[in-house]
Structures are given as structure tokens and as C-alpha cells.
Amino acid sequence: MANAETRIDSASARMFAALVCLLVASVGSAPLTAQSSANAVELLAAFSGEPAIQYQPLFQFSQESRIVAVEIYAVGTESTTAQYSGREHAWHVVNNILRITTADGFEGISGVDTYYEVEFTEQALLELHSVAADLLALQSLDPVVVGAMLKRSRPELSDEVRASIDIALWDLAARRADRPLYQLLGGRRDSMEPYASLPFYHTLPEYVDAVNEYATLGYRAFKFHVWGSIEEDVRLVELIQQTFADSGYRFMIDLEGAYGFEDALRLGGVMDERLFIMLEAPIDDQLLEQYAQLRSRLAVAIVPAGYNIYTPEFIRQGIDTAAWDAGRFDATAIGGISTALQLLTIANDADLTIDIQSWGHSLAQAANLHLMLANERTRYFEAPMPKQAYEFGMKNGDLLDVGRVIAPRGSGLGIDVNWEYLATADFYRKLGSEE
């Protein structure tokens, strides 16, 4: 728990000293890169550009720090079931929560959302539970080392399950350090500007009403998930520009890759850049050359969806083709904090902004928020609406404070889960394993 102490015996101290010498020697011979990082300390150094050897004890394994219990929860509420495009059915969202406990009383927690078209399911819960024995048998608590091991031993695992494990291990390390995760990642700011990300509505007045409603909470920027039909979407843009011309608000549209090039060009041409600041996923993410053409011909910023294609190679291809004004991904969908740090390092080296996604429940929001706070190029935090629905089961899930989103107080992710209250959800499953 929070008051537990990390113990380092004399043998560990000797190992630590040897590692210092090894790292000093390696720094003098070759610069570290995020992709070549063999462990979390090297990854932190590559991302921040500063030495991180002082954090080595946080990831060190011993019998006292071994994982002794694994709990997995799948939680869903009808209040988060929603459409994100007029071309899709409503999605049922399951918040998959991983809780690991060590022999010396520390915890590591993560939350990863998964989406299902027909009904809530325990699919991700069961996949995550299939790794419980692997977690109890771990001989390392380093998320980079563990991630590499699982790629070899469990290559079939989804990126969402990898993210669950990776984020929980980063949370565990930050809790051992007794500091917020963003500080462990090198972040110095503790708040940023949010925007209200709205689900799909079936009528134009509902969009106007939603803007007015969420503006009362302090939001000044809003993202619309729309029909994916050019005529209806143009009518929405024109209505918003007429209604909120002098409001000082800013707007974004997420097309979920629904358009072809010509429709994307037409909609972007209608959008007044003084009000509309971003067009997300106008076309299929694979069409990098067409993205580059849209970017060169439109005033509004162009970003990809970032959900299905997010490898380092793809990020580099997007950079080489000048496809985007900003890249995009969600740490909970791409394999976790470790993968996100690798991609952020590539983007930062190329002066490419990354618009990190944070749609999801509070634990998923927090994981991405800590990354954003550590990455100065990321400007906006995406806050899913309806706001309270995504805070279900959390004691301090409200991250909004006077028009800013703030890092939760406390170590690690900083989110305090109401474990008993989770069982009141519309959909609830729990599995566990112990030593």
C-alpha cells in the first residue's frame, strides 16, 4: 500500500552499482533510442533526454516485491452505450480493470475499455485472466522487460491486454516512488486544456443543446461525432458556425474514416478555421498520400484515427509523407505506456505533435493524461461525454477543475477505485488468482 517501503538488500545494492557503471559506459558509446530500449530506465532516458538511472530500484524484482495476487474486473453501464457515427450501431463499453498486489503491499492498477456491438461481454476479462498465472510467475517488474517476454511467450495476446499489464506495472513503479506517474515520466505541468468529446446525436438541435450544456461545466472546445454523410455533416457545420460565431468556442469533427477524398475536401472547405480547428479521421488511415493532399489544401488541422494502425513504421511513413498536422493514438489500445513512449519519442524527434486520445473511463483517461502531461507538444485532453457516466466506480474520477483537466492527486495513476461499488454496474464480472 502507500505506506509500504521498498527494501534493497546489499546484494541488490551491488547489482545497482554495477548497472550504473554499465549504463555510464553505454551512454558514452552509443545514444539510446526508444525502440532499442531494453528496460524501463533506458526508455525513460530516451523519452526525456535525461538520465533515469535513479529510477532503477522502482523496477527491481525481489521475493518481497513479487506479485502475489491478480484481480480482474469487467464493468459496464448502459449510460456509456452510444453511437460514434451515423454509420454504426451503438457500442457497449466494458471497463476492464486489472489490479495486481505485491508481497510487500503495493498495488498496480490499470483500466482499459473495450467495445462490443451487440452486448456487454467478458471477452477481454477472460483473455486477461489467461495471463494471471504468467503475472504471478514474473521474475521482473520492469514493464519493458515484461512486455518483451510476453511477446515471445504469448504472441497471441491483444494489444489491449498488453496495455492492461504494462500500465499496471508503470502504476506500480510510480506508487513505489510515491509520486504521480507523469512526474516519473519527466512531466512538469499538472494540468491542461480539455475538450468535451460528444457522442453521435440524431438531430441537429441535439448538437447545439449539448454544446450549451457542457459549456456550463467549463469546456470551451467540443468535438462532434457525426453522420458520415456529406450533406448532413455540412448542415451541422453551417449550423454550428451560425450559432456560435461569436462564442469564443472551438470545434472539431471526427469522421471515423467514413469519407472518400472528395467529400473530405468538400467538408473541410466549408469549415471556418476560426471556429473549427481539427478534422479527425476524414478518410481511411492507410491513405497517407491523400491525407497529405488534404493537409496541403485545407486550413483545418488534419489528424488520423490512430486506432488500427500505430506501429513505429507507420508513424515514420506519416512523417515522411507529411500526412498529418498531428499523429494520434491511445495508450490503452496500442500496448500501454511503454509503446506510447516509443512512439512519442519518434514523433518528438520529427517535431510532430501527437494528439493523444483519452476517450474511456477514468482509469483509461488517467493513463493517457499522465502521458500528455509529460509530453509538452500535446495540447488538448479529450474528455468523453456524458462526463459522469465514465467516472463510474471511481472515488475521484472527476478530473475537471475550473475549465482545466488536472492530474489526480496521489501516486501512480492517482485514481482511487471504489471496489465494492463496481458490483452495482449493469454488467459486472470478477476473476482472481493468488499465489
What do these predicted regions represent?
Residues 1-12:
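N-terminal secretory signal peptides that target proteins for export/translocation
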Residues 16-28:
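Bacterial N-terminal signal peptides
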Residues 29-45:
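Signal peptide processing junction and immediate N-terminal pro/mature segment
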Residues 53-104, 109-117, 386-392:
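Structured beta-strand/loop patches that form or line metal/cofactor-binding pockets in enzymes
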Residues 59, 64, 69, 101-176:
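Metal- or metallocofactor-binding catalytic centers and their adjacent structured scaffolds
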Residues 105, 165, 178, 254, ...:
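Conserved, mostly hydrophobic/aromatic
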Residues 190-298:
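Metal-dependent enolase-superfamily TIM-barrel catalytic cores that perform enediolate-based chemistry
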Residues 275, 286-404, 408:
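Shared catalytic-loop signature of beta/alpha-barrel
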